[in-house]
Amino acid sequence: MSSAPPAPRVIAVVGPTAAGKSDLGVFLAQRLDGEVVNADSMQLYRGMDIGTAKLTPEERGGIPHHLLDIWDVTVAASVAEYQRLARARIDALLAEGRWPILVGGSGLYVRGAVDNLEFPGTDPEVRARLEEELALRGPGALHARLAAADPEAGHAILSSNGRRIVRALEVIEITGRPFTANLPGHDSVYDTVQIGVDVARPELDERIARRVDRMWEAGLVDEVRALEAQGLREGRTASRALGYQQVLAALAGECTEDEARAETVRATKRFARRQDSWFRRDPRVHWLSGAAADLTELPQLALMLVERPVTA
């Protein structure tokens, strides 16, 4: 007598950029009668296709992909809004008896979707004062203040990322607690299996360089030029996306196109390291090799992990 198929659960496919998350997500959705829910913060933006490595309709293999192309490039990203949308979609899929396959490398977005994470509110006066100070003094001065108030946040947030520095300082002022104290523990709101795709740094760096080359060949500069006409340069979040920020600088004459291309590779490698560090801190992530030598085994190993009767 065969056992009944497992009841649908949430699967989160996580890890650094260029590790192979998207293809694994499609495979799992095909095998489990699931649908993909995007957890890449920049794939939420309409028209940002080449530079975010968004799967083409053909590459999606007939699998519905949710939360792609939902915001204009002028809209500032909101993890709280993403959380609302992602949970509504996850709840709907589970109610239909389908497996939600959350795919992406934006760590806070993954946590927002599946974990007990509440977002502190905002205070327009505090935000305006901090943004004015950012404009006058620059991000370095505010980052030094953040590092003194919350060393862990100072380490995690780049000294050049004025938007995130302002938000962290705003949360500290509103709550009276360190910014990192407002991040959740490892309390899931869903029965979730988290799969991390692991690729050794030398191989991942090579993949990133090749991916950036393919993006340029596919017309990233033209994509950015078209989005600039739609307000990309004024978009607080979208204009900072890897590749887009560098091409915007080239279009403004601040660097050459070759320099923008090289900086995109460097910045993406740095970003991949931060992504990897973020997910390594979560003991719930089951890591599987996504190395080229193991690619044929990865899908089946992931499927076996998901179909275990007991999750960790």
UniProtKB/Swiss-Prot annotation:
Pfam families: IPPT
GO molecular function, one term: ATP binding
Enzyme class: transferase
Site, Interaction with substrate tRNA: residue positions: 106, 127
Classification via InterPro entries: Dimethylallyltransferase (IPR039657), IPT (IPR018022), P-loop_NTPase (IPR027417)
Catalysed reaction, written as an equation: adenosine(37) in tRNA + dimethylallyl diphosphate = N(6)-dimethylallyladenosine(37) in tRNA + diphosphate
GO aspect biological process, one term: tRNA modification
SUPFAM superfamilies: P-loop containing nucleoside triphosphate hydrolases
Documented EC number(s): 2.5.1.75
Location of the region described as Interaction with substrate tRNA in the Swiss-Prot/TrEMBL record: 40-43
Assigned keywords, A-Z: ATP-binding, Magnesium, Nucleotide-binding, Transferase, tRNA processing
Quaternary structure, from the entry: Monomer.
Family of the protein in this entry: Belongs to the IPP transferase family.
Protein name: tRNA dimethylallyltransferase
Gene: miaA
